[in-house]
Amino acid sequence: MTAVREQIFAAIEAALTDADFAAEIERMPSAGPTKFPALHIYDGGDIPAVGEAGTDRWEMSVEIEGTVEGGTGAEAHAAMSQLDTSVIETLFVEPVLGGLATEIEAGAIRPLVAERASKRRLGFTRTLIIHYATRRGSPQVID
């Protein structure tokens, strides 16, 4: 069986890929983007939340890094904002991540400027908090 957290990451990657608004989507990349707009997905870890008898509850942090390239500062900023909006609209649907999670929250967004890039590049990191539950002691079984 596959761990629920791996299923959640696969669901995020699949949803963003299927939405087809980014030229590059990669999970846990080892280098910067090469196609734009780009979305990179990072594992921010998880922490236990208050559970109940027979259930482990978790809050998982997922960092979505988006990057756009080109245009004026205003155009790049608008494209960056639209990329973030598209991520939220794609992932915040019911059932949450196909029923793998009980809730998804949008955390902080941190805009980024690639100051040494050969072309104008703006980006963001958006934290998502994903709540999910597993059978106590069995991280492969959704509860």
Model segments located where?
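Charged, amphipathic alpha-helical segments and their flanking helix caps
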Residues: 1-31, 44-143
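A short, hydrophobic beta-strand-centered structural micro-motif
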Residues: 35-45
